Amino acid sequence: MDGTLFPGDDDLAIPATEFFSTKAAKKPEAKREAIVKADEDDNEETLKQRLTNLEKKITNVTTKFEQIEKCCKRNDEVLFRLENHAETLRAAMISLAKKIDVQTGRRPYE
């Protein structure tokens, strides 16, 4: 570790084969036929139910995005009003400070 700039620089690279396998497991022929048969059993009702569920989820997501958009727009309007209000208060405080300075004699009347 003497020649390393950061801790861990001297570590060896981990081979990718430790994380995943590049070969698919071979399935027995008997199970393969059962899987194909199960896939054929999907009738139109289950497909319609899947499509209906998917449509509900998409509708729900679009509704949430619309609500987020409205909320962001409302927050933008409120922020704009607050910024204008802060600027108005700043200008009023400066004029009040000038008025107090004139009345106390610290500054001549302009």
UniProtKB/Swiss-Prot annotation:
Signal peptide: none annotated. One of its GO terms (cellular component) is viral envelope. The keyword ATP-binding does not apply. It holds the Pfam family Vac_Fusion. Residues 36-101 form a coiled coil. The keyword Phosphoprotein applies. One of its GO terms (biological process) is fusion of virus membrane with host plasma membrane. InterPro entries: Chordopox_Fusion/A27. It is found in: Virion. Keywords: Coiled coil, Disulfide bond, Host-virus interaction, Phosphoprotein, Virion. Homohexamers, covalently linked. Interacts with OPG144 and OPG153. Belongs to the orthopoxvirus OPG154 protein family. Structural protein involved in the envelopment of mature virion (MV) to form the wrapped virion (WV). The wrapping consists of the addition of Golgi membranes to the mature virion. Participates in mature virion (MV) movement within the infected cell. May play an indirect role in MV-cell fusion. This is Protein OPG154. It comes from Vaccinia virus (strain Western Reserve) (VACV).
